[in-house]
Amino acid sequence: MAKYTNDELLEAFGEMTLVELSEFVKAFEEKFDVEAAAPVAAVAAVAGAAAPAEEEKDEFDVILSAVGDKKIQVIKAVRAITNLGLAEAKALVDGAPKAVLEKAKKEDAEKAKAQLEEAGASVELK
């Protein structure tokens, strides 16, 4: 029995019509008692189950998008939120866009966003 390489098989399949390929798949399924559609259905079921979990997000990243013209107030707000020192808070603000908080609870993230926006910064939650 001759052994064919993947390239040789792909070349042979490439020369077949869709009808011929469909017949081949049916014959393959019968001979080896497998079903070609089963893995696709399982993947679709897993993907469908994962979607609702994504909607119920409970951890957020607070991203400082832009500082605005009140840089000192934004640095003070960053220090209050993160307990960073002055130099670290200034470096964070100067490096915008940057994460101020990561994996924060929704309540804490919204509170931090409000504080930063009140100080004059542009903020987004991800």
From Swiss-Prot:
Protein name: Large ribosomal subunit protein bL12
Quaternary organization: Homodimer. Part of the ribosomal stalk of the 50S ribosomal subunit. Forms a multimeric L10(L12)X complex, where L10 forms an elongated spine to which 2 to 4 L12 dimers bind in a sequential fashion. Binds GTP-bound translation factors.
CDD domains: Ribosomal_L7_L12 (cd00387)
Alphabetical keyword list: Ribonucleoprotein, Ribosomal protein
Family statement drawn from the similarity comment of this UniProt entry: Belongs to the bacterial ribosomal protein bL12 family.
Species: Bifidobacterium longum (strain NCC 2705)
One example GO MF annotation: structural constituent of ribosome
Family annotation (NCBIfam families): L12 (TIGR00855)
GO BP field: translation
InterPro entries: Ribosomal_bL12, Ribosomal_bL12_C, Ribosomal_bL12_C/ClpS-like, Ribosomal_bL12_oligo, Ribosomal_bL12_oligo_N_sf
Pfam families named in the record: Ribosomal_L12, Ribosomal_L12_N
Function: Forms part of the ribosomal stalk which helps the ribosome interact with GTP-bound translation factors. Is thus essential for accurate translation.
Organism superkingdom: Bacteria
UniProt KW Ribosomal protein keyword: yes
Biological classification of the source: Bacteria, Bacillati, Actinomycetota, Actinomycetes, Bifidobacteriales
Gene Ontology cellular-component annotations: cytosolic large ribosomal subunit
Gene3D superfamilies assigned: 3.30.1390.10, Single helix bin
